[in-house]
């Protein structure tokens, strides 16, 4: 794009944001699209007028921000800064300790770390040698779930990423969750989820559970995009049973149950997870939201005599797994499905090149994150179709719905029937509100 085209895109997006305030019915949809366009155009503008040499040099320094964040999270520097007012680097150095490493960082190092963080927008400078919270850093104190996500990314995923070349040298392009950069980083041939289930891994498991809540509350992964993003849940027949596969403590099912009273829900997950979910399910929904201990690699309960429509819903599950294991998760669902049933996957659909650059990059960021930690992957629509083809020639994608409220997870609806032909990604498989790109 030329400079004039980019500035025109920014001007139009800004105007659309103003218009959103005058259109209450479609405000969230207009605002989401306008913000995406504005951020994408702004990033393209910066990229277009930075020399290739300088761009490469800047790119090579990006790991420094994560290294700084790693230290901040490990030593809990954000908790040493008061919610209101400011504190000196010397005072912070006196406060901070970690449970596994008592002791203090020198004032000079605390200052260097916080000054670096302030340079990329985390914290804000006060008087000389003092620091205060800004909106972003304060969230690390007030939102423990988001704090857990940032900690895991900086102190678990970041060290794993550094071991990716060694993991490839050692294991090749493995499909096994125990042969990952993460396993190399901890010096053990064990999967991340297996590690979490070990007695001394429970703290990390709890942190992971909080992190999943943190990334699902607000922003791109908010559950509200599933509930209020325009997917036609209201068109499902009265009494439809929605089976939330790997549904954790049931937060998505509970949110859907509140909005759509004609639907029933069954949350499936590991024993300890569903026990927790059942205990914490709101009393007024307990007659419509049930919990079942179920390994998603195992066959589904027999429901041939059940006349209800059954929707198998899996959110953020398949991306944790390589194609080998993702197929093993989908297969029992496909075997259980009848022509009136549906499978809905709430997953990232990696866009084709040349769409909004920000969206494309974030999709590939997540793809590498899955590779490093689990040997999982994010998938294009063609990859989902290929996975279904391997599992069952009767399983086909019907529609891909992109929430009108924004968000980065699509809802992929699939069904089984007697048809042997399959729609391609270039057909009318996307909903009317979705660009094919």
Curated annotation (Swiss-Prot):
Disulfide bond residue pairs: none
Which class of enzymes does this protein belong to? Answer: transferase
Q: What is the species of this protein?
A: Phaeosphaeria nodorum (strain SN15 / ATCC MYA-4574 / FGSC 10173)
Q: Please name the catalytic residues of this protein.
A: 319 (proton acceptor)
Report residues binding S-adenosyl-L-methionine: 269
Answer whether the UniProt record assigns the keyword S-adenosyl-L-methionine to this protein: yes
Concerning its family, UniProt says: Belongs to the class I-like SAM-binding methyltransferase superfamily. Cation-independent O-methyltransferase family. COMT subfamily.
Q: What is this protein called?
A: O-methyltransferase elcB
Q: What is its EC number?
A: 2.1.1.-
Please give the record's induction comment.
Expression is up-regulated during the late stage of P.nodorum wheat leaf infection and is controlled by the cluster specific transporter elcR.
- Pathway, per UniProt? Secondary metabolite biosynthesis
Q: What does this protein do?
A: O-methyltransferase; part of the gene cluster that mediates the biosynthesis of elsinochrome C, a perelyenequinone phytotoxin structurally similar to cercosporin. The first step of elsinochrome C biosynthesis is performed by the polyketide synthase elcA which catalyzes the formation of nor-toralactone.
Q: Which GO terms describe its biological process?
A: methylation; secondary metabolite biosynthetic process
Matches recorded under Pfam families: Methyltransf_2
Positions of transmembrane segments: none
What keywords would UniProt list here?
Methyltransferase, S-adenosyl-L-methionine, Transferase
Gene Ontology molecular function: any one: O-methyltransferase activity
Task: List the lineage, top down.
Answer: Eukaryota, Fungi, Dikarya, Ascomycota, Pezizomycotina
Question: Which InterPro entries does the record match to this protein?
Answer: COMT-like, O_MeTrfase_dom, SAM-dependent_MTases_sf, WH-like_DNA-bd_sf, WH_DNA-bd_sf
The record, for SUPFAM superfamilies, names: S-adenosyl-L-methionine-dependent methyltransferases, Winged helix' DNA-binding domain
Q: State the Gene3D superfamilies in the record.
A: Vaccinia Virus protein VP39, Winged helix-like DNA-binding domain superfamily/Winged helix DNA-binding domain
The gene name reads elcD
